[in-house]
Amino acid sequence: MHLLPEFASHHAVSIPELLVSRDERQARQHAWLKRHPVPLVSFTVVAPGPIKDSEVTRRIFNHGVTALRALATKQGWQIQEQAALVSASGPEGMLSIAAPARDLKLATIELEHSHPLGRLWDIDVLTPEGDILSRRDYSLPPRRCLLCEQSAAVCARGKTHQLTDLLNRMEALLNDVDACNVN
């Protein structure tokens, strides 16, 4: 289920392409839920800027896939189907996991908080009915910026940081994980 970094497109995605890609992802999610009436993990990489598919985002994605699969194994949860693909919005993973949706969401939140790359992952859990379990459902604060303690959404809207600084921070986190062989 890993993606080969050397095949990254480096395509600068436009806002209309990004919106279409998100609609397509939502349609894929609903199709998966019809095939497998168990919770669905929909996994993407948080990638600031217009280039969503790069060697860096694919390597970050691959670490996330490994961590999600290890989590399912550790918890004794069966992965019924899994797939990886690349859309205009970057690498995407989907895993149908036979587990209580609430437990799955709590475990993925913990993974996002405990893994050195967790801040770069966007892990959604959808119930078999198609409802997305949100961080807000668990009274968790919004995601923090990669560079400061502000909300990531506030910094993104205000364009507080240079894109190059954000991308350099992403790559530094990835290189640290690779150097330590963290999965």
From Swiss-Prot:
Record carries keyword Nucleotidyltransferase: yes
EC number: 2.7.7.61
Free-text function comment from the UniProt entry: Transfers 2-(5''-triphosphoribosyl)-3'-dephosphocoenzyme-A on a serine residue to the apo-acyl carrier protein (gamma chain) of the citrate lyase to yield holo-acyl carrier protein.
Single GO MF descriptor: holo-citrate lyase synthase activity
Keywords: Nucleotidyltransferase, Transferase
Entry's family note: Belongs to the CitX family.
InterPro entries documented for this protein: CitX
Membrane-spanning segments: none
Designated name of the protein: Apo-citrate lyase phosphoribosyl-dephospho-CoA transferase
HAMAP family membership: CitX
Lineage, broadest ranks: Bacteria, Pseudomonadati, Pseudomonadota, Gammaproteobacteria, Enterobacterales
Keyword Cytoplasm in record: no
EC category name: transferase
Catalytic activity: apo-[citrate lyase ACP] + 2'-(5''-triphospho-alpha-D-ribosyl)-3'-dephospho-CoA = holo-[citrate lyase ACP] + diphosphate
One of the GO BP terms on file: prosthetic group biosynthetic process
Pfam family, one: CitX
Native source organism of the sequence: Escherichia coli O1:K1 / APEC
